[in-house]
Amino acid sequence: MQKTLNKSYICRKLPKGVKIKIDGKLNEPIWKELRSVGPFEFPWAKKGDLRQSTVAKLCWDDDYLYLGYHANDISINAKNRGYKGSVWLDDVVEIFIDPTPKDKKYFGFELNAKGNLLDYSAEYYRKFDNKWSSPNTKTAVNITKGKYFQAEFKISFKDLGVYPKNGSKWRMCLCRCDYNKGRRGEFTLWTPNGKEKPDFHILPAFGWLVFKK
């Protein structure tokens, strides 16, 4: 079992005039300039697992948090489940964010490889409110068959009810479920949490998202 590791990521503010189109392509120059959060961990991996790599980058402006995922995946497994469907049963990338670390509440955004979004608010431990939604958040997915899929999130601060400032620190978990035919599911995340069985919702083990201009 792997120990917890509270990582941190410096989230840079977009330069004035720079825009990001949410199309899942990640082809704006800014995505190349931003550094990644670093390697994702495989705390529950077993011999023979594929351990397909994941890259994530983030930035922000006055109104939104932007997240780009590049997920290597030789075989996409996902269904069209619609909005707020059971996307955790698919190839999916996720972000959990806690803008107010003094409480036990956070927000979840899960996007499967078909572009279906599940958003919710939650209270630790696993008290989910699926009635909550983020109508101003936008997402998109783009698939390169046999190689990878990419996902983009544009998360609305207005919907979260909190606007970060330079130096603000939020808790964050980045994670992924990867399913491949004939194999067991693989679960990877940015900050391991010490649990013996896969579980992404361990709020005290979330990393830190640090907003900088």
Task: For the regions a language model picked out, list residue spans one by one.
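Structural preference for beta-rich elements and adjacent junctions enriched in aromatics
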Residues: 1-213
